[in-house]
Amino acid sequence: RYPDIEIDIVASNRMVDVTDAGFDAGIRYGGTVPEDMVARRLSADIRWVIAASPDYLERYGTPEHPDDLLHHRCISNRLGDDRIYRWELERDGETYQITVPGSVTVNQAETGLVAVLGGAGLMYFPEPLVAPYVKDGRLRLVLTEWSPLEEGFHIYYSSRRQLPTGLRLLIEFIQEARPLGL
């Protein structure tokens, strides 16, 4: 569609100063960005879910309450600041944060997805990432009544300069294409 526009994509879960790093923009979950940046929503809100393979659930059982996760093999998420993410669950206004026991720790959800598909344990995911695997039966969701809805993807860029034409076109394209159906 735009043959003269070049895109350089770098994937990282770290909070990057896109201006200092020489990038025009960054994309992340939620709208929290450094104060000198502008955030624009790219997607609808995203539900976060816990998924496991049918083999794992047959072998170790299905958790019925968040406390049950303490007795399961869980795949932990390492955040960009190297902290281990505490799973945030919510039901009827009640919030529950839990540090799960991690047999495996990953810093990218896609890496954890490979482990979960292989039966290594349970993991907390953005629902659109696992939806195709749930649909075809390779994964099952657990504790679905505790699945919170959080802010979706946002693109962020410097508020100190005019929006480059290429970046404006990219934003429009992403909003039109709706990646992951969002």
Where are these regions (language model features)?
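Central regulatory/effector-binding core of bacterial HTH transcription factors
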Residues: 1-38
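Short, hydrophobic alpha-helical packing/hinge segments within bilobed ligand-binding/sensory domains
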Residues: 14, 111-113, 130
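Ligand-binding cleft/hinge of the Venus flytrap
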Residues: 68, 85-99, 133
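Short beta-strand-to-loop elements that line the ligand-binding cleft
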Residues: 7-11, 76, 97-108
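Hydrophobic residues within well-ordered alpha-helices
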Residues: 69, 115-119, 134
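Paired acidic/hydrophobic, glycine-rich loop segments that form the ligand-binding mouth/hinge
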Residues: 25-28, 121-125, 141-142
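Flexible hinge/capping segments at coil-to-helix
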Residues: 36-47, 52-77, 92
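C-terminal effector-binding regulatory domain of bacterial HTH transcription factors
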Residues: 127-136, 140, 146-182
